[in-house]
Amino acid sequence: MQEKIAVLAYSGGLDTSCCLKLLEDKYNYKVVSVAVDVGQPEDDLKEPEEKAKKLGVLKHYTIDAKEEFAVDYIFRAIKANALYEGYPLSTALARPLIAIKIAELAKEIGADAISHGCTGKGNDQFRFESVIRTKAPEIEIIAPVRDLNLTRTEEIQYAKEKGIPIPVDLEKPFSIDENLWGRSIEGGILENPMIETPKECFAWTVDPKIAKDEEEYVEIEFKAGVPVAINGQKFDAINVIKEANKLAGRNGVGRVDIIEDRVLGLKSRENYECPGAILLITAHKALEQLVLSREELVFKEMVDSKYADLIYKGLWHEPLRHDLDAFVDKTQERMNGIVRAKLYKGSLRIVGRESECALYQENMVSFENKDMDQREIVGMVKFHGLQAAIFESLRNK
């Protein structure tokens, strides 16, 4: 009888390490593990590979997807000002790409199943499985932690029985996910929304209280809606994001602590570090205010909100997402310019912006010239609010 093979999305954490052994013990699969590089630390790629091999996988793959993540995902998110309840979607944005790469590998090696370590309460099960079913509908999906209804304590006990190194303990079980666009921190004492996030949770952002005492000015240049240079220095896609992370992070900008509405309907307390994302999206929105018309801005705000909602829910391949991209891309054709931001001890302010495509005309708004004859406005003003005036007259009869 031919061995059945499962491709496991493997991070090296407790959930996926338990999945690796459970696939062998409970499901009778041989395991091929894979990590997709979307900008996580080098150790977060090296250690899982070593750990997977020690735990007996047939083979481990590391797939470099950083460039694709930056260009095809992050840049799209910037153009759409993608924020879900104030969160720049760092984890949510990476999941479709990771799922695509895993599905492609599974098809390439003829795997019988694809497995992940998602729980039944989180968002990632929706994000992974919607993409996998789109890209590889013929391949079975197995989620051992969810399907066996395991608690964190039960996982730790199972790991001890199987000799799996435990990366967390019961006193400090923070779950951290990191990629090029940001870090997410959840679990443990953070589940109590009244407890302030401990300082040790943060890695990318300096505590605003001890950030440097001088204001730092940053100029970001955009071409067709995407950042191409910072402070006059040109960067490729990956490094422009890294530079933004560095500059905002060292000034304490980019910490997000929210109560978030999950796909399932649960509310969860989430902490994020996303300095570059906050800086770039804030600057991009400032440029749009300069360039787009009022009607475009009002409509695009609705588009941006829906775009973020689709990403958060894992609906990357939803036809509407492609439709929204078409609108967003059209608005970004003239989104060229420079935005100046001031960073200081956790605060971010836009203090300047310029564009050759600006609809802002200084000569027309200035109080010091007569390019626009004020007397010609009288007729327009007379009928402004006409319906409200009629309504009031009827109400007062």
Swiss-Prot record:
Question: Which cellular components does GO assign to this protein?
Answer: cytoplasm
Q: Which reaction does it catalyse?
A: L-citrulline + L-aspartate + ATP = 2-(N(omega)-L-arginino)succinate + AMP + diphosphate + H(+)
The upper taxonomy is: Archaea, Methanobacteriati, Methanobacteriota, Methanomada group, Methanococci
**Subunit structure of this chain's protein:** Homotetramer.
Q: What is stated as this protein's family in its record?
A: Belongs to the argininosuccinate synthase family. Type 1 subfamily.
According to UniProt, this protein's pathway is: Amino-acid biosynthesis; L-arginine biosynthesis; L-arginine from L-ornithine and carbamoyl phosphate: step 2/3
Q: Print the keywords alphabetically.
A: Amino-acid biosynthesis, Arginine biosynthesis, ATP-binding, Cytoplasm, Ligase, Nucleotide-binding
EC code(s) of this entry:
6.3.4.5
Q: Does the keyword Ligase apply?
A: yes
User: Binding of L-aspartate: at which residues?
Assistant: 119, 123-124
* Chain residues that bind ATP: 9-17, 117
Q: Which InterPro entries match?
A: Arginosuc_syn_C (IPR048268), Arginosuc_syn_N (IPR048267), Arginosuc_synth (IPR001518), Arginosuc_synth_CS (IPR018223), Arginosuc_synth_type_1_subfam (IPR023434), AS_cat/multimer_dom_body (IPR024074), Rossmann-like_a/b/a_fold (IPR014729)
The main place the protein resides is cytoplasm
Extract one GO molecular function annotation from the record.
argininosuccinate synthase activity
Residues annotated as binding L-citrulline = 87, 123, 127, 175, 184, 260, 272
The protein's gene is named argG
Q: Which organism is it from?
A: Methanococcus vannielii
Q: Which SUPFAM superfamilies does the record associate with it?
A: Adenine nucleotide alpha hydrolases-like (SSF52402), Argininosuccinate synthetase, C-terminal domain (SSF69864)
Q: Which domain of life is it from?
A: Archaea
- What name does the UniProt record give this protein? Argininosuccinate synthase
